[in-house]
Amino acid sequence: EEEDRKVETIIENYEKDKINKVTEIEKYTEELEGKEKEAVVKVRINQDKFREKLINKYKKCCLCNVNMNELLVASHIKPWSISDANEKLDIHNGLLMCPNHDKLFDRGYISFDDTGRILISEKLDDNNRMYMNITPTMKIDITEENIKYIKYHRKNVFIEK
């Protein structure tokens, strides 16, 4: 009987301790609400030079002609994360785009054929095509050097259906 009582006391204390810890954690997270914390961030080395070269070459979004440098994105055709060191800095692996078109391209909703004609994913419905100013007659200027990257994008990133 005394053994049972000891076990019950241990269990009771354990349960109380658990409740106190949860309460402590809740209090701590409430105190953190709206606060900031430091984070380690990976930075793409030479991305600024890559962007600068694309801005100097194209001067505007290759699809919609937005030309405010502050709004333009240096978009890798073959994604940066899987490009080798040379491909990451190769200007032929880049297109200059506004943020909306860059996001569509990065997510595979648009791509291009070897002549630069736009390919539009069936997943991009008519309303979003209209809102994003995407039409099947769009065409970008591409060079022979762009084609290997465009082919990669079309095969590995583009969502056809």
Residue spans for each PLM region:
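A short mid-domain helix/strand-loop element embedded in enzyme catalytic domains
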Residues: 1-52, 65-72
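A detector for short metal-coordination/catalytic motifs
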Residues: 39, 45, 49, 57, ...
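Ligand/cofactor pocket segment of small-molecule handling proteins
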Residues: 60
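Conserved active-site aspartate in kinases
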Residues: 76
